[in-house]
Amino acid sequence: MAKVHITNVVVLDNPSSFFNPFQFELTFECIEELKEDLEWKMIYVGSAESEEHDQVLDTIYVGPVPEGRHIFVFQADPPDVSKIPEPDAVGVTIVLLTCSYRGQEFVRVGYYVNNDYADPEMRENPPTKPLFEKLTRNILASKPRVTRFKINWDYGHINGNGNGVENGHQDEMATDGPSTSEAASAVIHPEDDNSLAMPMENGIKALNENSNSLAMEC
């Protein structure tokens, strides 16, 4: 049984300029004290074609974590535009929030991100070379996908993402955790059984389409 459950995520400052920081307010419940840190990462998927374009925007460590409810704001600088392929600069991509314990990733939350020009004329006739300073970033806050991985909470480090995947329909699945690029595909394709598409009725309440908050019941 997981000892940490994300119960709410609020996307702050959304929509926003491309060069503004990403900001997420995360609420999580810890069912018992954790002696070691939780490792949180924010990852920007630079291209669906290759994982080599992924950028870890920031990594933070939270802990030791006492039992109870905790809230913090995870803020990270925007991606390095020199590492984004020009054909992938404008349009839909993904930002991932992941959490690991003792080197084992146990949950990731993926959001669609749409980067487009605020100027209607530029949307109709986009420049050949992307003008990032003219782009607006819009995170589809009401439609995240959550993937949960079964890990060993009580013992030493285990390589990879654990022994299986948990979701609202299956407690365990005999499969290794996906790579970042595979996880990006999981966010895009709703038929992937290892992810929870939200909003849905299975213990998850989503706010309206224009809301930047997602409430999840554990």
UniProtKB/Swiss-Prot annotation:
Record-linked InterPro entries: ASF1-like, ASF1-like_sf
Record's signal peptide: none
Any one Pfam family match given in the protein's UniProt record, by short name: ASF1_hist_chap
One GO BP: chromatin organization
Record-listed Phosphoserine modification sites: 211, 213
Chief place of localization: nucleus
Record text on subunit structure and interactions: Component of the replication coupling assembly factor (RCAF), composed of asf1, histone H3 and histone H4. Interacts with the Caf1-105 subunit of the CAF-1 complex. Interacts with brm, mor and tlk. Interacts with Daxx.
Family note: Belongs to the ASF1 family.
Function (record text): Histone chaperone that facilitates histone deposition and histone exchange and removal during nucleosome assembly and disassembly. Cooperates with chromatin assembly factor 1 (CAF-1) to promote replication-dependent chromatin assembly. Plays a role in the formation of silent heterochromatin.
UniProt protein name: Histone chaperone asf1
Organism: Drosophila melanogaster (Fruit fly)
Gene name linked to the record: asf1
